[in-house]
């Protein structure tokens, strides 16, 4: 069957359980999540050269575009007003989808600011049939860094996504984990876990891992994140540790602004994607012990 990428809810819910062409190894110590390349035995079906040609044309065109202007990707990815967008607040939107032609393709996590490309994350979907592995490595080499049998995700302008919305506490330096938590690429849902396997959200896992690194100064930076889920986790921390904060009036005003910018946020309840009232959901997590 011809491979055709479609980023739908089923994929979101099953991603933690799938045994697919690429296994992801996530190291929270690095924002450069890697994809390991595996080769299976030869497929019993003959190679469809038309699919290979379609992949080659698409990946070659994308390579040329990226060499000229890394932000000029809307047309080739066929992004328009009909695409499902997640509102992050403060003029930012997120589009998570995919583009593929034959055996392979690219998952993209695109961030728009006032309708313009601000940043993105590209994840390769690489065919594991050994008969075409070398041909596809060459096709992907112009888009993704390849080293030690590993395809690395590609990021555009990620450093801007690591910055707070306001220039708050500029003397505070965040570690690599917390910088990645600031970006939408760590996941923009707010909550704890979900899906068929009950996996902890990536942003929540990082937040827990870095809990000892979070203090009032760092928390205020997190509350100013472009990432809507991270903002709410910052508010959650503040609500649980109010006595540690000195400038509560300013913080409370900012929290009101955050809620007005994003009255509702996406979460998972079991296997179901839900849109919940942001303020009410934070209040629920403030009451939780974990």
Language-model features, listed with the residues they occupy:
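Bacterial N-terminal signal peptides that target proteins for export
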Residues: 1-6
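Bacterial signal peptide processing site
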Residues: 18-20
